[in-house]
Amino acid sequence: MSFVNRIRDIVGLNESLDYDEEYETYDVAADSYNGYNDAAETSSRRRQRNHTPTASIEPVSTASNVIGLPGLSSSSEVVVMEPRSFEEMPQAIQALRERKTIVLNLTMMEPDQAQRAVDFVAGGTFAIDGHQERVGESIFLFTPSCVHVTTQGGEQYLNESPAQPVQTTTSFGRTATPTPAWGTDSRYAAQ
């Protein structure tokens, strides 16, 4: 045996030609020539081959089949977070994974860090099929998929635009309403 074949045997790449299967060999032709065809012995072989052991059935308790779901309890939990830095954001994702609702108050953070934090938590919320809503100035609500957010009127809140247009101040001191994303053509306005 060469060195390469030994390595293949060790690694398991060489397929062995020896099989561990057992075959029952019956020499039917030899039995017919010898006149040795005993029907009683043949039927006893068939009975032995067809005999299957019966399995004992034990009653299974239903309590052992119950699997607990972590984070899924009768009471829900709301976590209010007021982070001061982006490093606290993985805690919000972990809370969402535990099916907890997050109220994220970002007033204590710098605006660029707050935007980064909202993007990070929004991505995590999207990944678990959760919902996100802006509640107020720099305050956001992130919920897992098992929580549905409704407004006071009872209808489901689906990222609707505010009823009153947002007023912005131009560099000339005048107030102006921003142009809608769909333009001024009313055919493309949301109904």
Curated annotation (Swiss-Prot):
Q: Which InterPro entries does this entry report, sorted A to Z? A: Cell_div_SepF, Cell_div_SepF/SepF-rel, SepF-like_sf
Q: Which GO terms describe its biological process?
A: division septum assembly; FtsZ-dependent cytokinesis
Give the record's subunit note: Homodimer. Interacts with FtsZ.
Q: Does the keyword Amino-acid biosynthesis apply?
A: no
Biological role: Cell division protein that is part of the divisome complex and is recruited early to the Z-ring. Probably stimulates Z-ring formation, perhaps through the cross-linking of FtsZ protofilaments. Its function overlaps with FtsA.
Where in or outside the cell it occurs: the entry states: Cytoplasm
What is one term from the GO cellular component aspect held by the record? Answer: cytoplasm
> Where does the UniProt entry say this protein principally localizes?
cytoplasm
Q: What is this protein called?
A: Cell division protein SepF
Composition bias (Polar residues) maps to: 157-178
Family as reported in the entry's similarity comment: Belongs to the SepF family.
Specify where the region named Disordered lies, as residue ranges: 157-191
Q: Which PANTHER family match?
A: CELL DIVISION PROTEIN SEPF
Q: Which UniProt keywords apply?
A: Cell cycle, Cell division, Cytoplasm, Septation
